[in-house]
């Protein structure tokens, strides 16, 4: 724990230092002025993560909720500014290393050096402007709410009973200070218009104290489907006392699957809906650590024609494929949530957005129906996924 705290503190100090350095050049500030801007900025962006856990009652206060939303907007602006700054600084370093191999009096050396000087000083305002544009457009995208994406999903094990079976997937809603009644009702209304056979919520439904946001959680009771509404916990549910979160979900009409499954009978076909716990449970709820064999246990010894596994994080794909899962539904990655962070996600996750196939298993990773942290969805809109099973 001490090691993790040390690493976190070191990274935070490096980010503060780098931000101060970039603000000096971008806005022609003194070092002291830059520090005076950076410290309150970091508190607004990240302070709520600590304050809400130290004193959860703060989330009830409207002014604090507005402050959290402001921090979310600033986080998106800062994140975009920093990532573009890091990229441009990296390119400049590569160029500087390259021109050192040229004669210092050569025309090429002088022209490149002059361009680098102008870009670092006279044109340093470009990155903040780009960051502001991306932040504004990304914020407007979050206000619009999730889009509907329809996917025709083909698989060799889809028979005539399963043909045209409609699965609506909601993921990473992150109910909390910035996602409340209006946004949740928008999600519910758009979901119900899709005439779902089942609805699945693949984790990170709640990202705040469930006692304070009980009203918002209860709204999920309005989700209705012919064969039920199923959900699993993501990693964020564990940050708010998992048992309290699960109890609040069980007060709705959602069926919570914790290493469990349910079998739906469609004429002569048995469809299994299974849900596995998140890897976070290994440390925070070890009695309910992920157990794929237990999750897919067929206690009734029925012939299962099609197996659907709900797993918040998609990195379980290899084990799921080996054990015979037909369709893996996941979330967690947010697809990067907004440009340019979507370009970094493939470095961590093999399957991070949309439809894919691993051997014989189909995978769909929902990029998030809500958002986390920055109120920014530039280039990666929030999504409600409609998967229509289609016979080959």
Locations of regions flagged by a protein language model:
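Soluble catalytic domains of enzymes that build or remodel membrane lipids, polysaccharides, and related
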Residues: 149-150, 157-392
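Short amphipathic alpha-helical coupling elements at transmembrane boundaries
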Residues: 28, 65-72, 153, 168, ...
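Non-catalytic terminal accessory segments
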Residues: 1-144
């Amino acid at each position: 724990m001490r090691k993790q705290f040390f690493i976190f503190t070191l990274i935070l100090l490096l980010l503060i230092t780098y931000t101060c350095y970039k603000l000096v050049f971008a806005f022609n500030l003194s070092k002291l002025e830059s520090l005076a801007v950076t410290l309150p900025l970091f508190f607004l962006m990240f302070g709520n993560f600590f304050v809400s856990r130290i004193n959860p009652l703060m989330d009830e206060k409207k002014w604090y909720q507005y402050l959290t939303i402001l921090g979310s907007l600033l986080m998106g602006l800062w994140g975009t500014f920093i990532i573009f700054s890091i990229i441009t600084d990296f390119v400049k370093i590569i160029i500087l290393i390259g021109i050192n191999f040229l004669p210092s009096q050569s025309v090429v050396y002088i022209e490149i050096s002059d361009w680098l000087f102008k870009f670092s000083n006279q044109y340093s305002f470009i990155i903040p402007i780009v960051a502001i544009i991306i932040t504004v457009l990304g914020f407007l995208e979050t206000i619009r709410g999730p889009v509907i994406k329809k996917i025709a999903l083909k698989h060799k094990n889809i028979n005539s009973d399963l043909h045209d079976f409609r699965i609506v997937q909601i993921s990473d809603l992150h109910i909390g200070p910035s996602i409340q009644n209006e946004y949740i009702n928008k999600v519910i209304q758009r979901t119900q218009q899709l005439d779902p056979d089942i609805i699945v919520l693949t984790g990170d439904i709640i990202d705040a104290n469930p006692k304070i946001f009980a009203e918002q959680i209860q709204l999920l009771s309005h989700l209705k489907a012919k064969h039920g509404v199923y959900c699993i916990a993501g990693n964020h549910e564990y940050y708010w006392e998992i048992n309290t979160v699960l109890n609040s979900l069980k007060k709705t009409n959602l069926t919570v699957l914790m290493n469990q499954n349910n079998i739906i009978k469609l004429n002569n076909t048995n469809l299994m809906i299974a849900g596995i716990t998140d890897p976070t449970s290994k440390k925070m709820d070890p009695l309910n650590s992920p157990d794929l064999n237990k999750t897919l246990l067929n206690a009734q010894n029925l012939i299962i024609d099609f197996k659907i596994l709900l797993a918040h994080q998609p990195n379980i794909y290899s084990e799921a494929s080996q054990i015979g899962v037909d369709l893996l539904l996941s979330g967690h990655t947010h697809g990067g949530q907004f440009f340019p962070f979507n370009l970094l996600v493939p470095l961590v996750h093999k399957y991070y957005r949309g439809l894919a196939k691993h051997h014989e298993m189909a995978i769909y990773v929902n990029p998030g129906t809500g958002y986390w942290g920055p109120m920014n969805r530039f280039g990666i809109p929030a999504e409600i996924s409609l998967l229509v099973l289609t016979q080959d």
